[in-house]
Amino acid sequence: MMKFKLILLRGYKNIKFKISRFGYNFQKFRSGKMDRKELLGGVKRIVVKIGTSTLANADGSLNEDKIKQIVANLSELNENAEVVFVTSGAVGAGMGQMKLAHKPKSIVEKQALAAIGQVSLIHLYQILFWAHGKTIAQLLLTKDDFSDRRRYLNMRSVLRSLLAKKIIPVINENDPVVGEGIKGVKVGDNDTLSALVAGLIEADLLVILTDIDGLYDKNPSVFADAKFINLVENLDDSIRAAAGAEGSKFGTGGMRTKITAAEMATKNGTHLIIANGADPRNIVRAAQGCEVGTLFLAGKNRINSRKYWLAYSAEHKGSVAIDAGAAKALKEGKSLLAVGIREVVGEFERGETLAIKDASGRALARGITNYSSAELALIKGRKSEEIEAVLGYRYEDEALHIDNIALI
């Protein structure tokens, strides 16, 4: 059995947050007339994601002393802000419970350890948070909880209710149900999960703690001249390249998934900070606006929650490939017409969600279709006024209306 030692950490001062939720002056910050403390001074809803590399010892077991410090900092943060905690560590807790020195290779065995460890992990969190006068709630989620619109809205209502009561939701993916070998039902990683949660509750700030200081222009473990990137204002291809190519040590180390999380979060108006979890005090420092980690600056405009769900959570049933003119029109905020569609892939019905791709196969958007796959196959490349002549009827002039399209 794991031993739960209770150590109360003291000496932490309370943080003061401004109450204004969306009062960030992006222009001032970009022009250098505002620092991080001013920019983040109004955050009152924060998601903190902490991965296994921060929670675990070298052998994969949980580092309980580190966890005690993490809980102390999260509790302090919760004095003046709503906090959601996305945690890994269930497998490590299971290893400690079963006294295993090495993680098994079998997917089923790892799922079993996650099932065992989740009980130990949440019990440990409960004891430690109680010591700081905090109540927690557990949510184990799957991809379906996000893709199903009714479950998504219900989950949002539950989280809002918990936060209003100053309860700290502790969230993890339900690994025993959606293990690595089950495709299509797994979110994939807790970086993505934390970004989905941040979008769900419209968080002001997402803090991801990892085992390095933040983003570098190249792998600092390989290149001595690697430069630290303090601020990312525009997440472009140069930033994606800095995260490491797929299959490289740096990329498979997890920075690529954090960049994906940053893309998701910033498009929803949520600032994101990647910081080093070796010092748990960085949780508080990041929220206070101290110069820790890499700050990814949120977009100026928060997209509405329905479009965020459409872009990142809704399951798409098929896809359409569009020409350059249609792609340009989408980026300008216009609907997708049948004349711009070049290829229809998959089988789907009217009202289902599609992926919209350019000629190279790059995903541009997701949207709800006005026509089935069979109908689109007949009217692709046709002008809107020709639809009725081809089908014998016309639902809409647009194949997908801009109100039902979300760029990604």
Residue ranges and their predicted role:
Residues 1-2:
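Methionine residue identity
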Residues 15-33:
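Short, Lys/Arg-enriched N-terminal segments with co-localized hydrophobic residues
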Residues 6-7, 17-18, 351:
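Generic alpha-helical structural signal
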Residues 32-102, 107-135, 139-408:
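C-terminal catalytic "cap/lid" subdomain
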